UniProtKB/Swiss-Prot annotation:
Keywords: Ubl conjugation pathway
Disulfide cysteine pairs (residue numbers): none
The keyword Membrane appears for this protein: no
CDD domains: BACK, BTB_POZ_ZBTB_KLHL-like
Highest taxon above the source species: Eukaryota
Domain remark from Swiss-Prot or TrEMBL: The BTB/POZ domain mediates the interaction with some component of ubiquitin ligase complexes.
Name recorded for this polypeptide: BTB/POZ domain-containing protein At1g55760
Gene Ontology, cellular component aspect: nucleus
Amino acid sequence: MTDSAYRVDTISRLAQWRIHNLSSSTYRKSDPFKMGLWNWHLSVEKSKMLLNVKLYPEVSNLTRENPPVASFALRVVSSTGERKALSHPEVIDKRIKTNEDFIWTIEVPLTGKIIIDVEFLDLKVLSQDSGELYSIWANGSTENQSQVTAVTSLGRMLTESIYTDITINASDGSIGAHRAVLAARSPVFRSMFLHDLKEKELSEINVLDMPLDACQAFLSYIYGNIQNEDFLIHRLALLQAAEKYDIADLKEACHLSLLDDIDTKNVLERLQNAYLYQLPELKASCMRYLVKFGKIFEIRDEFNIFMQCADRDLISEIFHEVLSTWKGF
């Protein structure tokens, strides 16, 4: 028997298996065919007057961890003698993991040449985050690809200086950017360009409180192509820029990141920034680190210097935390 006897042809969402000679007692399993994220098999088992047709995904880590939830229409056509076409009712959202999860038993005698058509109507997977099903073919897939492409193109506009129309002057250098992008991401930038301010007239924005590498990281975040290493290095500068230019998502990203790696070397600086930029969770975490976990004793000299320079309200909060935590010790 030739290899083509086991081949399943596919086009778009249709899979078709042509079996040229189905004898009275036989079992056949197709070659794997790709549909969606998975490789699939069809199999037929004929016994006397019954024909069992199975559809199932190939065993793999993907199938085990995230099996497909399939909707499909299945049809068997026998072209020997009088043509017979049998259709299975549409299967909707059927979870198929093994070769026992979908079986169509046909009680009509079929011999000779048959064609099995499977038209996949939809394939879904379970979201690991929300626990909800989503289609791999829905508009969201195209939308996601479109978003990825758009962000990549936006990043190239910055890195390759494609049709830049405004210059950002940092403390030690300059970089070109685009008014429309800046205005879309920051109400402060948008206000600059709407009103007859010097930034609009000169096509320049001075951010002289930022070095060029931090400014580059700031713009990379705005354009959607920042690297994690650059983000971590420049978190505090990015936090300052987020506050200055009213970019709430950047401020929150910095806030969450600064919570991750508090230690004795950075806790005082982060406490000061948490107070300055009104980050209550970061402030509370720094307080607990210093007081409840006793790290205040490991940096006694640095803490004394900090207390001489800190804002009075912050000093008051620290004393309140100390009294509250150490009460009764």
